[in-house]
Amino acid sequence: MEIIPVIDLMGGRVVHAKEGLRDYYEPIKSVLTSAIDLSSVVTDLKSFFPFNTVYIADLDAISGQELAVGQYQRLVADFPEISFWLDAGIKEEKDLVVLSNIGGIRPVLASETLHDMTLLPGGEETILSLDFRHGQLLGDSRLWEDENLWPDQVILMHLDYVGNRQGPDMGLLKKVMDRNKEVNVVMAGGVRGDRDLELLNDAGVGKVLVATALHEGGLSRTILEIVTKKHCPMIKGSAINVSKLS
């Protein structure tokens, strides 16, 4: 299982996302970093654990502001070992082209903003995010109704669960897995600690987006080492006591 840290960026600062209520987001408070600028937060995340992938939600770009291309060019130059998944509010092909031209960036096509369905299912690098609020898909209903539009990798992002420490939406995950067992689901929202990772691992999830559990200390370095080992199953029977691990 791969754990992918999430960075929510708004007004040039890293913020704490909760339930998708962006008007109320505040600068992040974290046990891993005292910084709120993008580059420093990535540096501190890498110091904590050798993450291969980092997911960034550029909330300014998602809201329609111009993408700060230079910022991401510098980021990939500073961290060439990291694959950055970036949700920058792609609506149509020209938006996708801008991101695709930044080496080291994998664009995320999010249902909340995507207008051009011809971009899907795309190639093997395509990532679709199915965004939900109150159990309803945000965006074009065809993205839920027609699974032929789904690329190999699909993020399930239930905003009600983001930053809420209530566990992942296993019901939504089951609906997707029942419809298409071949899709590689990336689960997002609600993960509290190792018990939730064990549930997702058992359900066949290979990648998980996490923010709150990392920044509040719910996932230790030892836990991350266990769950990210290739072919290493999660411990059965009882969850690992995170509080006793450093």
Residue ranges and their predicted role:
Residues 84-103, 171-181, 185-207:
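Catalytic cores of alpha/beta
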Residues 102-119, 158-163, 190-193, 203-223:
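Glycine-rich phosphate-binding active-site loops on the catalytic face of alpha/beta enzymes
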Residues 47-102, 170:
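N-terminal active-site wall of soluble small-molecule enzyme domains
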Residues 7-29, 94-164:
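Conserved anion-binding
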Residues 118-122, 126-128, 201-202, 207-237, ...:
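C-terminal helical cap(s) of enzyme catalytic domains, especially alpha/beta-barrels
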Residues 21-43:
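Short catalytic helix/loop segments, enriched in acidic residues and glycine
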Residues 67-74, 139-145, 166-175:
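Charged helix-capping and loop-helix junction motifs
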Residues 2-9, 54-56, 84-88, 107-109, ...:
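Hydrophobic faces of well-ordered beta-strands that scaffold small-molecule active sites
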